[in-house]
Amino acid sequence: IPIKHVSNSASIIDLDGFRKDMVRSGIITYGLYPSEEVSKDVLDLRPAMELKTHIVYIKEVEAGEGISYNHTYVTDKKTKIATIPVGYADGYPRSLSSKGKVLIRGQYAPIIGRICMDQFMVDVTDIEGVSVMDEVTLVGHDGNKMLTVEEVANEAGSFNYEFVCGIGKRVPRVYIRNGEMKETEYFEK
């Protein structure tokens, strides 16, 4: 056999002797550890991916208003709601409906109602000065806070591999080097 490879991400980290001619880096390509069991002091991994968007609409509603399909969330007070243009068709897990969160202006905003095909809503009542086009962090850093892939995937009843592989073709890939945007790649137009 001219080329041998048996090492996946975990064995690259923990099993030196199995590297052979090639390795299959998999999840460590994203800067993520393959499991909690691997030695984290061997490779200092940093997440290579963030998932960000922006607010497209804001509306204030009174107490008792149903939000999203089938009114799966009903407001219990006057609430300011922001619409986020990402949904399960983009790979954002529907299982985060009414239980996930995002970061806006360095603060957590809870997801309210269902994750729809193309959008979902968050409660931004307590985020001062929030406005349309504000950046929304679904995974990554915002100020001194962070939502990790592992956190989001765990909340969705999943794991990091499934989350990163599930991000759909509709989501443009923006490549950044040294803080500067280098290229944007669109798979669907």
Enumerate the predicted regions with their spans.
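Active-site anion/phosphate-binding pocket segments in diverse small-molecule metabolic enzymes
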Residues: 1-189
